[in-house]
Amino acid sequence: MTRKIACSLLLLILVTIGLNIKTKVGLTRYPSWIVAKIVDSKPVKLTADFTHVLSNSSTAYIGYIGNNYQKFDISLQSVHKSTANRYTVTGVTMVRTNRCNFQGTIDVVENRQFSHPTFGLDNSMKGQFKRRGCTIAKYRFAENAQQKGSGVFVGYLLFYWYETNKGEIVYDDIDDFSDSYSNNQYAGTWQSYATKKSKPCAWGQYRVPNSGDLDVGAAEFSVNPKYARNGWSK
């Protein structure tokens, strides 16, 4: 009997190790900045329309372009769901005084549900939602080639949502009181049509992903003084 119990425990341990390895291997296909934010989550099947999450404009995007962290501004003017996992997008970008229009797509790669969700300040949201989750997607935004200084943005996007008790998927601002709170996080590259050269580029709401030492703020985003002259001092 003791031997059977020992064998059963060993089998359970091996299965658990195997599942953990499988999970870690599955996550390695994503950028490290995304992996760090989804460790407490698992894949979930979800049929949803994320239009209102992606088009949320409750706060402006903060962004940079280039290794010198030049200030980068972007706004989404329209977001429409075109297929089960694709959204078509139009918008405007601005670097210094150079303004470009763009259009492109956002393609959902995976939906995930958090295993141990929090419930907001003083647990005020406890019992107010079915689940909290996030979505990993890829984006490709092409600026108008006829405009000066234009190019193409490609990369990964991570955004957060929660499902209400009525089954509605909404923008997750439950933890917006937290210093580290962020949403709609984009990070990738921009490639010039003219020179074919690429630059790192990222933007997000409240915080900027994959931004090195750009953000030195504790309670909120605050640009590192050594980059202030790159468009941030206005």
Go through the PLM ranges and name each one.
Residues I13-Y30:
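Bacterial Sec-dependent signal peptides at the C-terminal "C-region" and cleavage site
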Residues V25-S75, G91-T93, G120-G149, L157, ...:
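Tryptophan-anchored aromatic micro-motifs
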Residues Y69, T97-T105, V152-Y156:
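Amphipathic hydrophobic-ligand
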Residues A202-D213:
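Short beta-strand elements
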